[in-house]
Amino acid sequence: MEQRKNVYPSFTLRKVIITVNNFLVEDIERVMTTVPDNETSRELSSVIFCLGRDAENEEEYDYAFSKLLELYKRDNETVKAWVIEAFSLLAVLKRDIKKLDRSIVEPLIRTAYSRSVGSDRAMIQDAIDNINQSLNWGL
């Protein structure tokens, strides 16, 4: 009986787990300064999502929110979509700590949505749906 060869390439996945609690402020700053404003990277997306997901108290929430606002200013529509998604994580997961400031977030969401296309637009729409459901907004 002939033995079949594995026709699929073999590879190993590197498991990367990053949380804000494991990120030092210096690490967050390093990622934010090393990735150019008009580019994306896996590490930058990890920082953005962790900022939205891992705040454990009001001080961390305020820090995360300010960093997300800073990242939103980048000249990259994908980064803006990631930031909007992180805002939705704050809205859904961290509303017991603090609520999103609608007067700040809503104009950013509307602007990002109007300029977005493809998967960025879909991500922003999902974030809008999550924010609307969590905070009873009508974006």
Question: What annotation goes with each model-predicted range?
Answer:
Residues 16-22, 53-62, 92-102, 134-139:
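Flexible loop/turn segments at the boundaries of HEAT repeats in alpha-solenoid HEAT proteins
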Residues 41-44, 80, 121:
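Residue-level detector of extended alpha-helical repeat arrays and alpha-solenoid scaffolds
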Residues 44-49, 83-84, 125:
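Hydrophobic core positions within HEAT/HEAT-like alpha-solenoid repeats
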Residues 2-46, 139:
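N-terminal "cap/leader" segments of large eukaryotic alpha-helical scaffolds
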Residues 28-39, 66-73, 77, 107-114:
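HEAT/HEAT-like alpha-solenoid repeats
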Residues 75-113:
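Amphipathic protein-protein interaction modules
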Residues 21, 110-139:
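Eukaryotic acidic, Ser/Thr-rich intrinsically disordered low-complexity regions
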Residues 49-53, 88-89, 129-132:
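Structural signature of alpha-helical solenoid repeat scaffolds
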